[in-house]
């Protein structure tokens, strides 16, 4: 049985904010902000990583139905490569909070730092396992990103994106070596950058030989 967090901890107009996808080698980083309704309990809220896929899917719909407000946002691969993953994540969190249809009086951010927001905010380390609103945000972000990676698996077959969701598993690294990076791979991440540099060297060597 998967026990959820105590819904009595929910406070009015407090947004929970979380992200999914900082570690993968490809795809966007996805964030969500959720303001829960203390009068509409949701059973079983917990850190998305502690829930089964089926339970996350069910909660995804229930959260969107019962929340006072919610927003799913993102930072694209190009933004990650340009800004770095930390700043891109902060940008995506800003977008999630700014996209809420109701302005929160406080935003609780999973982790140890907060993005610049127009509302008061506070970081909560391991917040997705403590704060129901952050847990709800983690579920929205994870389900949304997982669905996208499953769709991208059809666009870029052979990489196993539907399974590992872009994380640097042995099978993903092997596919990267065999097939090379796709347009959705993060060029600023070391394994992808190393592969691009290797390809560049392999292309340049014959040219230098011809010039001798």
Curated annotation (Swiss-Prot):
EC top class named in words: hydrolase
Its catalytic activity?
A: Endonucleolytic cleavage to 5'-phosphomonoester
Q: What is its main location?
A: cytoplasm
Pfam families in the cross-refs: RNase_HII (PF01351)
Matching entries from SUPFAM superfamilies are given as: Ribonuclease H-like
Q: Which PROSITE patterns match?
A: RNASE_H_2
Q: Which GO terms describe its cellular component?
A: cytoplasm; ribonuclease H2 complex
Residues that, per the record, bind a divalent metal cation = 18-19, 110
Where is it located?
Cytoplasm
Per the entry, which co-factors are needed? Mn(2+); Mg(2+)
Q: Which GO terms describe its molecular function?
A: manganese ion binding; RNA binding; RNA-DNA hybrid ribonuclease activity
Please indicate which superkingdom the organism of origin belongs to.
Bacteria
Cofactor binding, per record: Manganese or magnesium. Binds 1 divalent metal ion per monomer in the absence of substrate. May bind a second metal ion after substrate binding.
Q: Which residues form the RNase H type-2 domain?
A: 12-201
User: Between which residues do disulfide bridges form?
Assistant: none
Give the keywords, sorted. Answer: Cytoplasm, Endonuclease, Hydrolase, Manganese, Metal-binding, Nuclease
The family annotation for this protein states: Belongs to the RNase HII family.
Give the protein's biological function. Endonuclease that specifically degrades the RNA of RNA-DNA hybrids.
What this protein is called in its record is Ribonuclease HII
Organismal lineage = Bacteria, Pseudomonadati, Pseudomonadota, Gammaproteobacteria, Pseudomonadales
Q: Which gene encodes it?
A: rnhB
